[in-house]
Amino acid sequence: MLALFLCVFLSLTSPIIMSWKQILKDYTYFLKIERALSVNSIKSYQLDIEKLIAYLEEYNIKASPITIGKDELTQFNYHIAKSLNARSQSRLISGLKGFFNYLIFEDYRLDNPMDTIESPKIGRKLPDTISTEDIDNLIAAIDYTKAEGERNKAILETLYGCGLRVSELTDLKLSDLYFKEGFIKVTGKGNKQRFVPITETTIDYINNYVYNSRLQLKINPDFSDILFLNRRGKQLTRAMIFTIIKQLAVKINLNKTISPHTFRHSFATHLLENGADLRAIQQMLGHESITTTEIYMHIDRTHLHTAINKFHPRS
């Protein structure tokens, strides 16, 4: 209760926005130390609260983290609904509920004003995928006269051949490669590690990059163990991977928007279509729950309908 008293006192004697920013700083520390979340997850939660702070500033609403109520937050919800789709809005609401639960946990508040605010109903969005032909065309479109050509080929093949998240790809280290055993060690969400099998094709592409163009780089000592590097010998960013893929998609006139995650979805879908066990796919993707992996069953049903229409004698 002392923390509650002090926070109310500070909210009356300090600038309201500063009190938001101080508590946001404390919350960020909590997410990092107590919950051990990844940098990207923490940034997402920060952005949720920063959007609320910006809204309060824009409309000159005098409310601190302690005094803000459901009326102000309901209006904020209406405000964000104008610019966010249902899925993004639902995620933001969930993030703010977590923030106010933290304030209750720290005795700053007695209630969660977000409890009465419902998330919009959203359907289960099926992942976007591309065909093996599309993937071959993307790889063929790489300019191998440039120094980064071999690297980009290895990147695309690793995304598709191992089903990695983009952050898992950029964090991949040379010391994570167990080619003799046919596996790579992947560090996923929550710093959880898993071993993912790797094909001979992907091994060849990575080795070609490692023992050729990568050797030509002046590698920054801080990134000597990082597999995929930029021209300056530093770790590639997630944004750069997105850019590489986007440029190749434009180059082959691919009539859909794709991202690094499209390769991960395609990896899982193509395995399932060709008879792979769902549990095995779950382990390779690093999903906590089989329910998350089951979404690929919905995609595969189209494939099953095609099969029965083509091969069943009564179709």
Feature locations, PLM:
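Conserved catalytic core of the tyrosine transesterase superfamily
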Residues: 5-315
